[in-house]
């Protein structure tokens, strides 16, 4: 045993710098606290990009910084989060730059309720993925059960509370206790057997109940075997495990979850006074319906009585109806006859207008009129055509070459009969035809002068 643990550091009246002090303190801490276990709750969890994990480990009275480097963090199986209770192993070291000491960890394990909570979450996720919590699997509770099975401990306040509720609210319901342990490892197979037995007894509903306790005390109701036994029950089952704040896997699998065992009993035990009020309400509704029905039937009967009369009265009504129909038929016949008579008159008028003699007379008058108009039209047309012809003859005479020839001019034609317009079209000795106003001459070109010659228009 070291009597003076600081003697080995050589601190006899030596004046140290802060860095030297922190360095020697780190050596001392790492030498003494080399491989220790510490239990606490995680807070201020941080995961930087480096892959290291930093958090504060705390209990009700103190806290210490922890560092879990990347290579050790990769070996931690459970997900770390704030509030998780853990056990950590490592060494105590000192961060010289700030003078803060910390735990350098190599192992992190869940502790106490923390481990149970991880197992709870894992099983919950597994069963939820299988559909054991889905609403489609839930069976509705019977409205008026007669026989109920209770799976619980035969001792304790739970069974007494359940029986008390049924005695007060529904004393006529038959209760059967299927005793089982409700805590510890031995409780798991007992609860499974009790569920199978109760489901085979043909109860109207089942209650799975236990009083409050810690998460560890209630853990048997979070076991997979118990959850699957609850799911396998055909009988509607109410899970009432722990207090209102306690939630178990069996609560999720059961058809209905009750916050307490007493609440489970109230769900299945209809209140007698409430039933009496329901019956009274139904009685009042039935009386009202009967009165309404009687009133309706009475009115209907009175209406039928009014319609039911003496046969003689019915015959008089029929005779009156026949007279009315006869009068209506006569009026209709007269209206039809008048309508047809008026139509016949209109047709006769139209036919008279279409008589052949009348048509022939009209045609004869039209023919005579046309015969009178035709000679006059022919004379007028002939006169107009004559005037038009004279105008065209005058126009033709003005533009005709013959009129020009008549005034003393001539037209020279070559051997092909083409008109000679310029002297350049001729050559000396060429024979031409000169066409005059009357007759023609054969001429020969003695000479062709290409210079223009001005003609007098006064000759």
From Swiss-Prot:
Broadest EC class assigned to this enzyme: hydrolase
One GO biological process term: DNA catabolic process
Enzyme Commission number(s): 3.1.11.6
GO molecular function, a single term: exodeoxyribonuclease VII activity
Domain of life from the UniProt record: Bacteria
Catalytic activity of the protein: Exonucleolytic cleavage in either 5'- to 3'- or 3'- to 5'-direction to yield nucleoside 5'-phosphates
Keyword Nuclease: yes
GO CC annotations on file: cytoplasm; exodeoxyribonuclease VII complex
Gene3D superfamilies to which the protein is assigned, alphabetical: 2.40.50.1010
Coiled-coil residue windows: none
InterPro entries: Exonuc_VII_L, Exonuc_VII_lsu_C, OB-fold_nuc-bd_dom
Protein keywords: Cytoplasm, Exonuclease, Hydrolase, Nuclease
Predominant subcellular localization, coarse grouping: cytoplasm
Cytoplasm keyword on record: yes
Compartments where located: Cytoplasm
Pfam families per record: Exonuc_VII_L, tRNA_anti_2
Alphabetized PANTHER family for the sequence: EXODEOXYRIBONUCLEASE 7 LARGE SUBUNIT (PTHR30008:SF0)
Assembly, per entry: Heterooligomer composed of large and small subunits.
Record function comment: Bidirectionally degrades single-stranded DNA into large acid-insoluble oligonucleotides, which are then degraded further into small acid-soluble oligonucleotides.
Similarity field: Belongs to the XseA family.
NCBIfam families per UniProt: xseA
HAMAP family: Exonuc_7_L
Listed name of the protein: Exodeoxyribonuclease 7 large subunit
Source species: Pseudomonas fluorescens (strain SBW25)
